[in-house]
Amino acid sequence: LVLDSGLYAGVWGSNVDFDANDNIELDYYGGYSRETGALSYDLGYIDYNYPGGSGDFEEWYLGLGITAGTVDLGATFSFGLDNANDNIELSAGTELSGIGLGITLGDYDNSGKYTVVSASKEIGGLELSLAWSDFDADSGNSSDEDAVTFTVAKSF
């Protein structure tokens, strides 16, 4: 749900495989975002849930962005609640021949660093995305992971 005022709320879900009890992730989120010329900002809250598992957590985030020509640059700062890890993320994106291209670099405090490289295209009202992700753990609390993900999304 997105309102003209800039307020938004939603639910996001996916399958996961963190341990034997975690097989689904359901996130509830809301916030306020605005664009003013080439600048944008987004202040929001996310509640991450793993029904039947453990590891639920919440965070507040502040995202800042700027468009420079055909390139979008962004930085997001996430503040974990109740001992959840903080996160800083830098991103860049552009469009080339109708295909969106992006890269994201991030660092979760005391957990690990990650990179995501993606390509996306809208076809018939569906957003198709192909991404490669790499997570390098800082300690034994997490494990290194690489993945290739294909996503089909539809916004209402």
What residue ranges belong to the model's regions?
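Outer-membrane beta-barrel proteins
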Residues: 1-156
